[in-house]
Every structure is written in C-alpha cells, then in structure tokens.
Design a protein with these regions (language model features):
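C-terminal helix-cap and adjacent tail motif
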Residues: 2-18, 25, 126-163
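Short histidine-centered catalytic/ligand-binding loop motif
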Residues: 64-87, 140-148
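Short connector loops at helix/strand junctions that flank enzyme active sites
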Residues: 45-47, 59-62, 67, 81, ...
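A short linear hydrophobic-aromatic micro-motif
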Residues: 51-53, 104-109
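Generic beta-structure capping elements
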Residues: 55, 67-69, 123-125
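Long, well-ordered alpha-helical scaffolding segments within enzyme catalytic domains
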Residues: 80-100
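Active-site microenvironments that recognize anionic phosphate/pyrophosphate groups
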Residues: 1-66
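Histidine-centered divalent-metal-coordination microenvironment in nucleic-acid enzymes
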Residues: 63, 109, 113-139
Length: 163
C-alpha cells in the first residue's frame, strides 16, 4: 500500500466536532433524497430489493453502486428479505466485476455520510496495482485520470448482463 502523494505530508489537527451533525440528504431537515427523486444515474439492473448504477465520473472501469429500492439508511434498517438477498447479490456483483478482466480485487465500501439512502460501492482495484491495496484504493481512485462516462456505463451494463 502506498499513498498517491509525495512526501513530506503534513498531518492536520482534527477540526472542532460538530454536534449535532447537520442533516444529510434524505433526512428530516436536509435536502431531498437524490436516489428517491430520480436524480442519480439510471439503473442498469434491478430486482425487488436493489438497483445497480454506474458512477458519473471516475477513474476505475467496473465501479458500480448498489442502492436499496426502499428509502432506508443502513444495513440495520433493511427489511429481513432485502438483508437476506444482499449477501448473495453482492457475491454475484463481485464475480461480474472480476469477469470484466484486469481486476485484482473488488472492494466494497459503505460510507453513508452524504445521504441517508442505503447504498454501497463496488470498486475494482486494477490487476497489479498493489500500491492501491486496502484503504488506499479510494485515494488512488480520486487522483487517477477520469475515464469517459460512456466507458463507465458500458462496464456497468456488462456487469448487469452477468447478473
């Protein structure tokens, strides 16, 4: 693992804590949920519990995000049926991304700080790009040159077809 920055780096002091935290998109007092309002990229695949979407902008071909069809915030808020479907579906998405080729590993991330609608990211680490292993992959994804949205969407469609 290696940071995508040259030394020396300067460690910042943490900012003052903000309590209570401001509302996120989709929470009372926050902006409307973009997923529920249809403001996100169109789904390339969906079933009764989840929808799969390509990113807008990005540097890693094969990246996709999976959202719950119902407006819930977290794993713990999923219906029992959706929670039971998540694991097998995540495995299928991972296999489909690996099937694109040139992928060393598929990372699964859920941050949840931007919006209150459950979604996870599947991010492929390029084969042989060991400096982007582990927690370094999102940092590298941020600094690598973006690929065309059409290429990202095409890869997402190929992932969907494999499901």
């Amino acid at each position: 693992m290696q940071l995508p920055y040259a030394e020396p780096l300067t460690v910042l002091e943490p900012s003052e804590r903000v309590v209570p935290e401001p509302p996120r998109r989709g929470e009372d007092g926050g902006e409307p949920c973009g997923i529920c309002a249809g403001q996100s990229t169109a789904a390339v695949w969906q079933d009764e519990h989840f929808s799969l979407h390509p990113p807008v902008g990005g540097s890693l071909v094969g990246a996709v995000w999976l959202a719950s069809r119902e407006h819930v915030d977290s794993f713990s808020d999923l219906s029992p049926e959706a929670a039971a479907a998540f694991g097998p579906l995540a495995a299928r998405v991972e296999r489909a991304i690996l099937g694109l080729g040139d992928v060393g590993r598929v990372h699964l991330y859920r941050w949840g700080d931007g919006g209150a609608h459950f979604h996870v990211w599947f991010i492929p680490r390029p084969l042989g790009m060991l400096e982007a292993s582990g927690m370094m992959l999102p940092l590298w994804e941020d600094v690598l040159p973006n690929v065309a949205d059409e290429e990202l969407a095409d890869a997402a469609r190929r992932v969907a077809e494999a499901l």
